[in-house]
Amino acid sequence: MRDVTVTGLDKAFGAHPVLAGLDLEVPAGSLTAILGPSGSGKTTLLRLLAGFERADAGTIGIGGVVVDGPGVHLPPERRRIGYVPQEGGLFPHLTVAGNVGFGLPVRWPGARRPGARQRRAGQVEALLETVGLAGFGRRYPHQLSGGQQQRVALARALAIEPAVVLLDEPFASLDAHLRASVRADVQEIFRRAGTTAVLVTHDQDEALSVADRVAALRDGGIAQCAPPEDLYSRPADPGLASFIGDANLVDGVVSGSTVKTLFGCLPLDPAATIPGSAGQVTVLIRPEQIDIVPNENGLTAQVTSFRYYGHDAVLYVQPEDEAGGAGSQPVVVRVAGGTHRAAGPHLPAGTTVTLLARGPVFAWPAD
């Protein structure tokens, strides 16, 4: 298991800069997700780590060894990188065992010794057992589900005993019902193997649910790299808060350890850095921090849209001002499936609800 260190990385294609001064630390044995929208440079970063592209400036180190930098560029085969492309990249004419063992004759020094074939077969079967596909060695890729194909691709990447495994949006092609289970499988496989891994994705749910650390890519650099719960609850700025998930960004005034908002006074997250512990701020209230409360004092609002997903429901509401008219900006509320019935069996547009927000809340000094 090796760490990955990226310092001051630049990459442009012609006159189009993609990465600019990017810094990133991937701890040994961790699963780090690179999260960014399409076109943000996620795959370019992965290709630079793999050695498929050369950096224009900066350095990349793996396990303390510089593999890309001024005067240095180790080719992919010398970096001990396992690579899992988006579609898996399995050879259709090879069996599952053939795909998994494809790199072993090159990697394994004893490949030509007596008994090597049997040892190789045993190693392949052990890898298949690791990814939950014991007994699948004689099947062909077309006989597998999408999730099984991705696990074969992962076993092939692990076969070379890599320093780092790189995964390029590995779940994007899977059906929605498979995606969550395969994510959990991959997370457990890496946990057991103790392998350092870097995964790129545009899916916030995927990054937050799978990774030990999430690095948000923006404007060619890393806007913030943190554990998922910190990135979600304590993002670096309001723009990042909106990118990571639904966010209610409201005005507030800080006084000591509380902040006054349209929801009343709420406790302030101690991690929020407010100069002087007072003044105008922008407050982050996630939709799940807001409850619908019957017959209680709270913020009165009218439902403008209601979306039911089974496990939860999302309401878009317009707060009322003190005179009963439309007040401040719209608010997003997320409640567990069924709990919205506290306000009635249905919540069509125009329904009046009472809202209560729960702290602590995070905030930034207002611009």
State each model region's role.
Residues 4, 19-21:
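Conserved structural motif at the start of ABC-family nucleotide-binding domains
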Residues 258-367:
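Non-catalytic connector elements of ABC transporters
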Residues 80-82, 86, 90-239:
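ABC ATPase nucleotide-binding domains
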Residues 58-69:
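Conserved ABC transporter NBD signature motif
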Residues 35-37:
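The feature captures the beta-strand-to-loop junction immediately N-terminal to the Walker
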Residues 50:
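Helix-to-loop junction immediately C-terminal to a conserved catalytic motif
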Residues 56-59, 219:
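Conserved coupling/switch loops of ABC nucleotide-binding domains, chiefly the family-specific signature
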